[in-house]
């Protein structure tokens, strides 16, 4: 019996983690615009049964989202595969592409990977979220069940799945900012940070992630390719609906104050886009 053909567009840490996870059960075809990362030609990828889209969605200077990398993948898409969009996109994006490219099949499935431990995270997911038409999410559910023994597979509409991803990322980003504020206050009044932290996290409701100040990179606040762009994208998006996300906005302001190394500004094409907004 022949294996399922799985294509991957974008061979960064997300694409690599997906390739690693599905290699035992599928024939893989991987394409990246960087020739050094590309393993197969684009036509072969679009001829697969399923195609994971793992391309960047950086932010413009005003915080809004650059979807040009995602758009370019759909411009060359075919009607054969089910396209599984893993790139972080704002609510309504998958729906919009499905309407624009009505001949192709698209669902959204957010990734919850940490770049440093992406492969392990892929194998130990606490849940899989599939957003789109039920007939399509059922097919993708079957694909995931070939590889993972995860009972918590949530099937919903694409808009809900897209929002869920932003809820996660902006919550954790804001959590980092809150902890930095606590640390500043602790230092100012001469309290014992380690004791305070131990007492704080002993309440199981707090959780055990995104608590360290400085963070895992030895720096205050958060940087990298995900949190800064996702926070700004959601803030920009919410303004269109006259919703002020004041807590998230305040967290971003704190991050700008404490984070000396604004490394996301140097990650053109991943975190920031210098293209002109449309």
State what each model feature region is:
Residues 98-107, 118-209, 237-244, 250, ...:
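Internal alpha-helical scaffold of NAD(P)-dependent oxidoreductase catalytic cores
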Residues 46-47, 79, 125:
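Alpha-helix C-terminal capping/helix-to-coil transition sites in glycosyltransferase folds
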Residues 1-46:
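NAD(P)+-binding Rossmann beta1-loop-alpha1 motif at the extreme N-terminus of oxidoreductases
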Residues 50, 58-117:
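Rossmann-like NAD(P)(H) cofactor-binding subdomain of soluble oxidoreductases
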Residues 2-4, 26, 190-278:
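NAD(P)-dependent Rossmann-like dehydrogenase/reductase catalytic/cofactor-binding core
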Residues 20-24, 75, 99, 236:
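Short, well-ordered alpha-helices that flank and scaffold nucleotide-derived cofactor binding pockets
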Residues 50-54, 129:
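Structural motif
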């Amino acid at each position: 019996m022949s294996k399922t053909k799985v294509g991957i567009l974008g061979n960064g840490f997300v694409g690599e983690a997906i390739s690693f996870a599905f290699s035992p059960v599928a024939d893989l075809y991987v394409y990246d615009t960087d020739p050094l990362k590309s393993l197969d030609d684009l036509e072969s990828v679009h001829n697969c049964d399923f195609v994971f889209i793992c391309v960047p969605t950086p932010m413009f200077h005003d915080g809004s989202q650059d979807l040009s990398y995602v758009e370019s993948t759909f411009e060359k898409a075919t009607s054969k595969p089910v396209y599984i969009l893993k790139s972080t996109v704002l609510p309504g994006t998958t729906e919009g592409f499905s309407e624009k490219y009505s001949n192709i099949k698209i669902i959204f499935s957010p990734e919850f990977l940490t770049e440093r431990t992406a492969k392990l995270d892929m194998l130990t997911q606490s849940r899989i979220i599939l957003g789109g038409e039920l007939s399509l999410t059922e097919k993708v559910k079957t694909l995931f069940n070939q590889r993972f023994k995860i009972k918590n597979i949530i099937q919903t509409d694409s808009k809900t799945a897209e929002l869920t991803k932003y809820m996660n990322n902006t919550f954790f980003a804001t959590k980092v900012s809150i902890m930095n504020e606590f640390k500043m206050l602790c230092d100012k009044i001469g309290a014992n940070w380690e004791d305070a932290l131990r007492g704080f996290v002993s309440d199981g409701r707090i959780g055990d992630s995104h608590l360290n100040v400085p963070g895992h990179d030895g720096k205050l606040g958060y940087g990298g390719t995900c949190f800064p762009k996702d926070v700004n994208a959601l803030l920009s998006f919410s303004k269109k609906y006259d919703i002020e996300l004041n807590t998230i906005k305040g967290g971003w302001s704190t991050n700008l104050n404490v984070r000396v190394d604004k490394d996301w500004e140097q990650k053109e094409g991943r975190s920031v886009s210098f293209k002109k907004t449309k």
